[in-house]
Amino acid sequence: MHCVVIGGGLSGLASALWLSEAGHRVTLLERRGSLGGRTTAIPLDIVDDVPDNGQHVFASGYVHLMRYLDSVGTRESVCFPGHMTVRMPGGGTRRSAFGRVAGLRADKPDISSAKVPADLLVTGIREARRTKTPISIGYPTVDLDTLFIDGAKKAFANNGVEVRHRAVVAGVEVVDGTVAGVILNDGERIPAGAVICAVPVWNVKGLLDQVPGHERIYEAIEHLTPVPIVSVNLYLDRSIGMTDWGEILYGGEGVLEQVWDRQQMHSRNASRNHFYSTTVSAAYELTQKSNAEITETQMDMLRRYYPDAAGAEVIHSHVVRMPKSTFAQRPGSSGIRPDQRTAVAGLALAGDWTRTDWTTTMEGACQSAARAVDVILDYANQPR
Ligand SMILES: Cc1cc2nc3c(=O)[nH]c(=O)nc-3n(C[C@H](O)[C@H](O)[C@H](O)COP(=O)(O)OP(=O)(O)OC[C@H]3O[C@@H](n4cnc5c(N)ncnc54)[C@H](O)[C@@H]3O)c2cc1C
């Protein structure tokens, strides 16, 4: 069967890979010039380094993401040290259980549903009981393109997956309750026996107009609102003396501030500079500031928490604003996330915003892909 996957983020990549592993012919359509969606590396010639668009951390229960890494051959590039450190202003540190779970991204508590972290905790505890290991947070030891994309490209070449860049899908075509193909924004029609739509919630409007019940799916757009994350890749002239690979700054200005030591995480040679990355979640205010102001804010913060950062000089600063990083689920919107199965035969949804056991995470993206692929494989096996 010819399957079309719309969107080349983790959910689309995993869908394309697993459909091709099941023997189907797959075309992957991505509107940008590169794959990876919200998980990408950004090579920086000026410092001859490859930082990411933002630090991504893993939780020990990420079974579907691990399945994806098995498919692309990079499972060994994720490390679970079993600890994170909480750092106090002035430099004191604590290693705590809080550090393990607080590594996951957060939104402002006054505007987001308490059900989301509660569900996350339940999922984490269930996975920990199932695998008989304590919940822990891990990190990639390579950049995100090496982790997610390079191996996927090889697997696509082996499995005959066609990847089309700058292919913007305008709509899914439905005939007599069955999917018939997709239409690109330049009018080209691509016929398909099955389609997985793996675009983010903020891009889904208009794509499913021919799907019965699409109004209900589009309701999610109002309730799952984008949360900005600002990351700053700081190349400094000296070590700031982090004791752990990742540290959560206790009592920071925003919802959650974290600092990452790429020397420890990537076994990076620091002879030319020391690379630290900072992450500010729910950075609604910070994202409005200039790059110079953001860098200054982050350096001030490092100086408050790390005595060794007092005299540090910035060799290069790289600010990454991601205004649509994750989504916040507003109170009262439980049940708003749609199932992967749609009312149209041969059409499934994927993406971190569709209904999974997780909130907006890489694991949610991959779990949604696994479920969407199951829907399509069921359909492929039905007699027609
Ligand atoms: C800075 C940052 C930090 C994060 N930290 C973590 C973390 O620590 N742990 C964690 O688990 N998660 C984290 N996340 C969240 C995680 O990255 C996302 O949940 C996940 O990558 C979403 O994958 P996706 O495939 O659902 O969507 P996306 O990655 O957004 O992929 C969707 C793709 O669809 C394409 N597309 C959209 N519209 C169209 C169209 N009409 N036609 C064709 N293509 C289209 C887009 O260009 C994109 O490539 C973080 C995200 C960010 C940005």
List each language-model region with its residue ranges:
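Active-site/ligand-binding neighborhood in enzyme catalytic cores
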Residues: 106-175, 180
